[in-house]
């Protein structure tokens, strides 16, 4: 971050999880670690405001990766998450996407 501040530009993009917004039983350590990074991102965004360094937060829902025991083709693909990252990175310095939530259509536990 100090190098980006010296240059007057840069991007910090943290990939979080929708568990920061709504969690489920059995994943307390995972939820807590993502929530800590979420809080850090929000404070860092305020601290770096006006320096030219963007702090972006992506909150993907379920993603079908090898991390999961069973395949979940109804979840987001890694490529769909990458597309969301590219969307965030393509935003201008004047108007950028601070936070983006992307969920698979099957997820309904956020209501």
Name what the model sees in each region.
Residues 2, 46-47:
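Alpha-helical segment proximal to the catalytic Tyr-Lys
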Residues 24-28, 74:
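Active-site loop immediately N-terminal to the catalytic Tyr-X3-Lys motif
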Residues 2-8:
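A short helix-coil junction within the Rossmann-fold of NAD(P)-dependent oxidoreductases
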Residues 20-22:
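Conserved catalytic-site region of short-chain dehydrogenase/reductase
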Residues 33:
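Active-site helix of classical SDR
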Residues 17:
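Residue(s) in the substrate-gating loop at a strand-loop-helix junction
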Residues 57-58, 72-110:
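C-terminal helical subdomain
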Residues 54-64:
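Conserved SDR Rossmann-fold cofactor-binding beta-strand/turn motif
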């Amino acid at each position: 971050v100090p190098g980006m501040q010296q240059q007057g530009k840069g991007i910090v993009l943290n990939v979080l999880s929708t568990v920061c917004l709504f969690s489920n039983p059995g994943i307390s350590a995972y939820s807590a670690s993502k929530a800590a990074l979420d809080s850090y991102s929000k404070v860092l965004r305020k601290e770096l405001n006006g320096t030219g360094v963007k702090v972006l937060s992506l909150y993907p829902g379920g993603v079908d990766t090898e991390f999961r025991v069973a395949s979940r083709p109804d979840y987001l693909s890694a490529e769909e998450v990458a597309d969301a990252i590219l969307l965030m990175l393509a935003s201008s310095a004047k108007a950028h996407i601070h936070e983006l939530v992307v969920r698979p259509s099957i997820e309904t536990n956020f209501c």
